[in-house]
């Protein structure tokens, strides 16, 4: 019987993958045969996670700060330089604020919106040619946007 979750031959990018939900998603993809790129702005955590996940398959770490447009474009460029096709994009990077609602500064709001909204839009549009190239009529490529309240705890 073939493995229902076999995704061999596919390539994925998981952002915010140094820990938590992102690391768990990357683990599942690797165990299903996917070459998986992981990214995070926290370099030490990212490469530690890469080392752990490499036991499951080909895991490549790229350090990137997606809170800026330049960081998004830089990550997309590195992916496009390495992979002509991207079958799966998991937009998981995110942040929350560290202030009470009534004291919340505009700079904090901008940071949250840049990472949680703008970065996933621009990363998707930057990688769209690679995503379209991976898609077929029988097997479309996937973009998954993740939201969580993990940062609130």
Predicted regions and their residues:
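Residue(s) in the substrate-gating loop at a strand-loop-helix junction
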Residues: 148
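Conserved glycine-rich Rossmann-like NAD(P)H-binding loop of the short-chain dehydrogenase/reductase
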Residues: 32-48
């Amino acid at each position: 019987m073939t493995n229902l979750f076999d995704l061999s031959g596919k390539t994925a990018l998981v952002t915010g993958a140094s820990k938590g939900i992102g690391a768990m998603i990357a683990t599942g993809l690797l165990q299903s045969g996917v070459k998986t790129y992981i990214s995070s702005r926290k370099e030490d955590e990212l490469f530690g996670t890469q080392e752990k996940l490499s036991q499951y398959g080909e895991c490549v770490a790229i350090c990137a700060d997606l809170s800026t447009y330049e960081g998004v474009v830089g990550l997309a460029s590195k992916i496009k330089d390495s992979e002509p096709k991207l079958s799966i994009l998991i937009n998981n990077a995110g942040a929350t604020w560290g202030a009470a609602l009534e004291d919340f500064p505009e700079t904090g709001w901008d940071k949250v919106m840049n990472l949680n909204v703008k970065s996933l839009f621009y990363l998707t549009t930057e990688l769209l040619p690679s995503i379209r190239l991976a898609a077929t009529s029988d097997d479309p490529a996937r973009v998954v946007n993740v939201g969580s309240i993990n940062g609130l705890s």
